[in-house]
A protein has these predicted regions:
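A catalytic-pocket lid/entrance helix-loop region that shapes and gates access to the active site
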Residues: 115-119, 215-312
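Alpha/beta-hydrolase fold nucleophile elbow
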Residues: 190-203
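Alpha/beta-hydrolase fold catalytic core
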Residues: 293-446, 451-452
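N-terminal cap/lid subdomain of alpha/beta-hydrolase-fold enzymes
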Residues: 6, 10-16, 63-167
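Alpha/beta-hydrolase active-site loop
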Residues: 141-144, 151, 168-186
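Short alpha-helix in the alpha/beta-hydrolase fold that links the catalytic acid
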Residues: 440, 454-464
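Catalytic histidine neighborhood in serine/cysteine hydrolases
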Residues: 467-484
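Catalytic histidine-centered segment of alpha/beta-hydrolase-like enzymes
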Residues: 481-493
Length: 507
């Protein structure tokens, strides 16, 4: 071998990545069959299905250094109903993924959509172990064949090189990879004759909104997009100096949470009344006050602080000390501070104990802690039943993906930096998709007790879509009395399914 033919250090470094991708793509699909018990009472039905878990390659495009080579192996898990004749390949198909952005699809898979689910207590708290799956009578399998996707570096999915990893851990690179996975899956299973839907949760709505537009570039016009706990416009969610939007958009959620925990008085001690009062205050007074900023008089500041305190359950003096701007961290650690407890972020009905030395930053989110262990244990047991090798670790949540994510828009340069700037916002993509595809419909679901992606922030994001009145009619927004993963509450699991069925019937 000549010197020029010797592998470089970079090539040697990438060999384990590429070997991992090649090994996964060479594995045979895992297949099994089962019967889903869907519905309750006289409406109950049994649906026989085939289960297929397999890796789908993300193939490099013609602009990459090695066009045609797989740059990732992405794990997919599909439930395909038995059907007669042509119905087998024409049944509506739903692709689903979660967010993070470093999360696997386990939450939607075993929380709401799939034929099995993990039980969580009615009030959002953690049940006692051990954990296992149970039948899900409100599975969406009644309406669609289901395909769950784990993006690169979640679940069992991996990229083939460091350069590919950098691309995939970015807003647009992630969208391109998942679009290719869906296209390839449709081709492999000959399902281009099916109506195609997407469902995304949290950051999955960020990617879902962008995919509605991206899939059109690949010749796939979606019939519908379902957005659960929206995070399309990060400016509405990120508390940062100079960005006043979250202070106003979180207040109705703060009010709902404070009322739930018994911190509001008088007429505000009613869930609906507290939300309505906070929404009205934001529109009529708070946004104007934030706009005026330092020009407010002392009397005006005092009056505003008093009202914000009444709505949030926090002392007016604290509100004034915070310059009339309550952050999520302040709310989480202050609302129940006298009880030594911290409020949950993703499920604010849940609270957890503070350390004896009470800090001012959230040590952990009791809302998410309540579900991680049950889901992690249950999914491994369920995968073993399906014949999936659980010796390989299934990444429920990959914190390294979250930490290494590139939030700008545009291509990644050689140093892993993005050409874009500002807050990530895919409402522009969804707006364009609604203009390009006259048949695209959107269903949105928000929890009143979600302080990660508050319902009021979603209201704002939807109102900012660059569409006309007729296009806006193709969007429905429904609300639930739980948090980010509202489907962990059985009543809202059923309501979500009922809202979906009614939405589909109106098509």
């Amino acid at each position: 071998m000549t010197d020029t033919a010797k592998p470089t250090d970079a090539t040697k470094k990438e060999e384990p990545w590429r070997e991992a991708v090649e090994q996964r793509l060479a594995e045979a699909p895992v297949r099994s069959s089962g019967t889903a018990q869907v519905g309750t009472g006289s409406g109950a039905q049994r649906i026989d299905y085939d289960f297929i878990a397999q890796y789908i390659p993300v193939v490099s495009d013609g602009l990459s250094a090695k066009p045609g080579e797989p740059e990732a192996a992405v794990y997919t898990l599909a439930y395909l109903a038995h059907a007669q004749g042509s119905g087998a390949t024409s049944r509506p198909l739903l692709f689903a993924f979660n967010g993070g952005p470093g999360s696997s699809s386990v939450w939607l898979h075993l929380g709401a959509l799939g034929p099995k689910r993990v039980h969580i207590n009615e009030d959002g708290t953690m049940p006692a172990p051990p954990y296992a799956v149970e039948d899900n009578p409100y599975s969406w399998f009644e309406h669609f064949d289901l395909v769950f996707i784990d993006p690169p570096h979640t679940g069992y999915s991996v990229s083939a090189s460091e350069d590919a990893r950098k691309r995939h851990l970015s807003v647009d690179g992630d969208v391109s990879a998942l679009a290719e996975v869906m296209r390839a899956w449709l081709a492999r299973h000959q399902r281009f004759g099916s109506a195609v839907y997407l469902a995304g949760e949290s950051y999955g709505t960020t990617r879902g909104a962008a995919l509605a537009d991206k899939m059109l570039d690949l010749g796939v016009a979606l019939s519908g997009v379902i957005l659960v706990s929206c995070a399309m416009d990060l400016q509405t969610l990120v508390f940062q100096a100079g960005n006043d939007l979250p202070h106003s958009l979180f207040l109705p959620g703060f009010a709902a949470t404070a009322q739930y925990h018994g911190k509001l008085k008088g007429a505000l001690n009613d869930a609906a009344a507290a939300r309505v009062a906070a929404e009205a205050f934001v529109l009529e007074d708070y946004l104007v006050a934030l706009h005026r900023g330092a020009t407010l008089t002392a009397a005006q500041r005092s009056k505003l602080a008093k009202r914000i305190g009444e709505l949030s359950g926090l002392p007016a003096a604290l509100v004034e000390q915070q310059n009339l701007r309550i952050t999520d961290q302040t709310f989480f650690t202050q609302l129940l501070r006298d009880e030594g407890r911290v409020v949950g972020r993703l499920e604010s009905r849940v609270s957890g104990p503070m350390a004896a030395r009470r800090g001012y930053a959230m040590e952990f989110d009791p809302g998410i802690e309540a579900i991680v262990a049950p889901y992690a244990s249950a999914v491994n047991g369920y995968f073993a039943q399906l014949g999936i090798d659980t010796q390989r670790r299934y990444g429920i949540i990959n914190g390294e993906v979250n930490q290494g994510w590139h939030w700008g828009r545009g291509p990644v340069d050689g140093k892993g930096k993005m050409s874009g700037n500002g807050y990530t916002n895919t409402t522009v993509d969804l707006s364009r998709a609604l203009r390009r595809n006259p048949h695209l419909r959107v269903l949105v679901a928000s929890g009143h007790y979600d302080l990660g992606t508050p319902y009021s922030a979603t209201n704002y994001s939807l109102a900012q879509l660059d569409v006309d009145a007729e296009q806006l009619k193709r969007i429905e927004h429904h609300y639930y009395d739980a948090g980010h993963m509202m489907y962990t509450r059985p009543a809202d699991l059923r309501k979500l399914k009922d809202d979906l069925a009614a939405w589909l019937a109106r098509a």
